[in-house]
Amino acid sequence: MDRTRIVRRWRRNMDVADDAEYVEMLATLSEGSVRRNFNPYTDIDWESPEFAVTDNDPRWILPATDPLGRHPWYQAQSRERQIEIGMWRQANVAKVGLHFESILIRGLMNYTFWMPNGSPEYRYCLHESVEECNHTMMFQEMVNRVGADVPGLPRRLRWVSPLVPLVAGPLPVAFFIGVLAGEEPIDHTQKNVLREGKSLHPIMERVMSIHVAEEARHISFAHEYLRKRLPRLTRMQRFWIALYFPLTMRSLCNAIVVPPKAFWEEFDIPREVKKELFFGSPESRKWLCDMFADARMLAHDTGLMNPIARLVWRLCKIDGKPSRYRSEPQRQHLAAAPAA
């Protein structure tokens, strides 16, 4: 009897037709995917001379928004070394992105497999899957053009990646929290790079611009999906989800943002530099906290920021003020200039 009740509740949660506002939001996102979408081989002119990847191109030097790019150790390296490190780093970020999106695509396929006929979520999830497939092709083409043999995600996460998408069917709330934990750091980092206005290599600039434009829809869907489902959970489920939320955010952030072991060995980067970069200095800790301002807003708005959850956010070192609105730029307050 209990098992039957659980299955009925699970199926009932899949039906969203009674929520007109949510259905309208899904229609808007789906129409946006039809009107504005990108193809990696028609919207990026890979063979253009402008997109050629050449040695000693200073546009591959890491920007100041990258924690390594603003570190004194990196800035003390020769220009050639900075370029080499920058190319490897950016190629690995792209490889991490395609690994994560491959997991996301498989999870969305598992989730939509169980949807009832007529579900508006089905259409949008398929639109998102198509866009993510294009992103993986785009990221892999960038890696191939750069020519660095980068590993992407840490080995342990690559090993368990076939299992993660299986969560999406029976535990969709946990899965979509994981989706945000992967999408938010990448999106935050790329937006900061584009906002900085530094001269970037055309491949990197175009790939980032396309990814940020389409990822806005994907993150919006994940946020609205959770806003709808979280209030339906039982009190005990909400308690455990409130703890799972920050733990997942921090663990996936580490896997996505921190370069793999091969990077530190390849360029013989001192251990103390790594410790300071991730996340031992005040600047790097602020950068870490800023990534999850939108996630904290979601936790606040859905009642997941209880006293114990606040402690877990603090222990994970990703606590702080929530965003006032999604994608609010996180700016440093400038010190007032001394009077003349």
Curated annotation (Swiss-Prot):
Q: What GO molecular function annotation could you give as one example from this UniProt entry?
A: oxidoreductase activity
**Superkingdom per UniProt:** Bacteria
Membrane topology is:
Multi-pass membrane protein
Cross-referenced SUPFAM superfamilies, in alphabetical order? Ferritin-like
| Compartments reported by the entry | Cell membrane
Q: Which Gene Ontology cellular component annotation is one that this UniProt entry carries? A: plasma membrane
Q: Could you tell me the keywords of this UniProt record?
A: Cell membrane, Membrane, Transmembrane, Transmembrane helix
Q: Name one Pfam family in it.
A: AurF
Q: Which InterPro entries did the record assign?
A: AurF/CmlI (IPR025859), Ferritin-like_SF (IPR009078), RNR-like (IPR012348)
Q: Which residue windows are transmembrane per the record? A: 162-182, 239-259
Its recorded name reads Uncharacterized protein MT0908
- The protein's organism comes out as Mycobacterium tuberculosis (strain CDC 1551 / Oshkosh)
